[in-house]
């Protein structure tokens, strides 16, 4: 080095074994780990020095870089530390810093590199010994991984100095209220943690949920009103509905019926005998007297075959007539109608009476009957 004593806060020009020159403010020298820390560092590249890997200069300014002592080739003091108005020699004072030099500091928002003090604070601590710096934690830096280099251990990259002022102004405008008044009271590498308020996204989410709740309540009220109107409606459930795939084919259906077989079947049921017709008084096959049960079997004649009228057995007589011989029973007529016209449709109940008296949508017939009954009893 050009001088025998290192100056904390002075501007240092450092050349590494890779022939790359760095300029920055001397921050601290760690004798135990053999490292040198520079603040506000800028790389000027190899600058025509002989090397296998030439590097161009860079415009980025790093907050600090810790260099390994074994990889440093040369160190030169460019500028001595700036003079600061030190206090009187008082053994009670351990460390001090000027607030006027850091006037821009209150507007700076929270930064992950807040542990690195400013240049003015470095100048104020130029007379501190290495023991005081170690006891106050000045030699500790947050471990931030950067690109590998044989002489650079840690580095913090920031933007160019021209863009930093604009970014600070923009961040100061958009910074939270609780963070605008934060300022650093000394070069401490590990300051007290800040009580940062939680992000406003969950709060906005809860506000949106509260704004959405009234429409849900309205929808619930609408449902209750609809239920009160139609709660007495009879539910019509269709059981075993018959599905027709196509139109009915009358020709194929008529082809299945044989007229002669049907006539023969009806004659057998009615006990008609074409060959030997019975007498008028002995006609046993009177369909009017003979009735069929639900199974279609003819019941026995309550009167005798030769008894025309018996008062004790039946009110009806057994006198044959042309109308009685042609008349069929209800079971046969129902079967004949089913074969001719098909299955009749089901009667759906409850269609004309909707809602009853509570819903107010019922038919007018029950109300008319109610008014007539009240008029008859004399009630109003």
Curated annotation (Swiss-Prot):
It comes from the Eukaryota. Keywords: Developmental protein, Ribonucleoprotein, Translation regulation. GO terms for biological process: regulation of translation. Disulfide bonds: none annotated. A motif (FFD box) lies at residues 307-323. GO terms for molecular function: mRNA binding. Residues 369-380 have a biased composition (Polar residues). One of its GO terms (cellular component) is ribonucleoprotein complex. Residues 214-230 have a biased composition (Basic residues). The keyword Membrane does not apply. Residues 236-272 form the DFDF domain. SMART domains: FDF, LSM14. Residues 268-287 have a biased composition (Basic and acidic residues). Residues 1-81 form the Sm domain. Residues 164-175 have a biased composition (Low complexity). Pfam families: FDF, LSM14. A motif (TFG box) lies at residues 325-345. Residues 160-241, 268-312, 352-380 are annotated as: Disordered. May be involved in the storage of translationally inactive mRNAs and protect them from degradation. Plays a role in control of mRNA translation. Belongs to the LSM14 family. Component of a ribonucleoprotein (RNP) complex, at least composed of cpeb1, lsm14b/rap55b, ddx6/Xp54, ybx2/frgy2, pat1/P100, eif4enif1/4E-T and eif4e1b. Different translationally-repressed mRNP complexes probably exist that contain either lsm14a/rap55a or lsm14b/rap55b depending on the developmental stage. Component of a ribonucleoprotein (RNP) complex, composed at least of elavl1/elrA and/or elavl2/elrB, igf2bp3/vg1RBP, ddx6/Xp54, ybx2/frgy2, lsm14b/rap55b and, in a subset of RNP complexes, stau1/staufen. This is Protein LSM14 homolog B-B. The gene is lsm14b-b.
């Amino acid at each position: 080095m050009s001088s025998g004593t290192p100056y904390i806060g002075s501007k240092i020009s450092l050349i590494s074994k890779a022939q790359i020159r760095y300029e920055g403010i001397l921050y601290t020298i760690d004798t135990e780990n053999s490292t040198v820390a520079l603040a506000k560092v800028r790389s000027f590249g190899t600058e025509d020095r002989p090397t296998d890997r030439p590097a161009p200069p860079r415009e980025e300014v790093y907050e600090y870089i810790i260099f390994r002592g074994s990889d440093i080739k040369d160190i030169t003091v460019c500028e001595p530390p700036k003079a600061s108005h030190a206090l009187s020699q008082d053994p009670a004072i351990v460390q001090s810093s000027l607030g006027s030099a850091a006037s821009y500091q209150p507007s700076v928002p929270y930064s992950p590199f807040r542990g690195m003090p400013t240049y003015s604070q470095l100048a104020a601590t130029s007379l501190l010994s290495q023991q005081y710096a170690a006891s106050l934690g000045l030699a500790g830096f947050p471990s931030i991984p950067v690109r590998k280099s044989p002489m650079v251990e840690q580095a913090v990259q920031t933007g160019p100095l021209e863009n930093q002022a604009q970014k600070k102004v923009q961040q100061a405008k958009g910074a939270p209220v609780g963070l605008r008044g934060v300022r650093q009271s000394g070069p401490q590498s590990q300051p007290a943690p800040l009580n940062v308020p939680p992000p406003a996204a969950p709060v906005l989410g809860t506000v949106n949920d509260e704004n959405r709740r009234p429409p849900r309540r309205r929808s619930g009220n609408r449902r209750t009103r609809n239920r009160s109107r139609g709660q007495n409606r009879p539910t019509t459930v269709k059981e075993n509905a018959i599905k027709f795939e196509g139109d009915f084919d009358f020709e194929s259906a008529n082809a299945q019926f044989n007229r002669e077989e049907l006539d023969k079947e009806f004659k057998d049921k009615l006990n008609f005998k074409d060959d030997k017709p019975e007498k008028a008084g002995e006609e046993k096959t009177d369909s009017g007297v003979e009735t069929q049960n639900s199974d279609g079997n003819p019941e026995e004649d309550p009167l005798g075959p030769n008894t025309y009228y018996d008062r004790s057995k039946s009110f009806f007589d057994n006198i044959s007539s042309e109308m009685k011989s042609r008349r069929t029973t209800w079971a046969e007529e129902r079967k004949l109608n089913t074969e001719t016209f098909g299955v009749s449709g089901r009667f759906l109940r409850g269609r004309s009476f909707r809602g009853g008296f509570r819903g107010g949508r019922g038919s007018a017939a029950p109300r008319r009957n109610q008014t007539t009954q009240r008029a008859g009893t004399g009630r109003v």
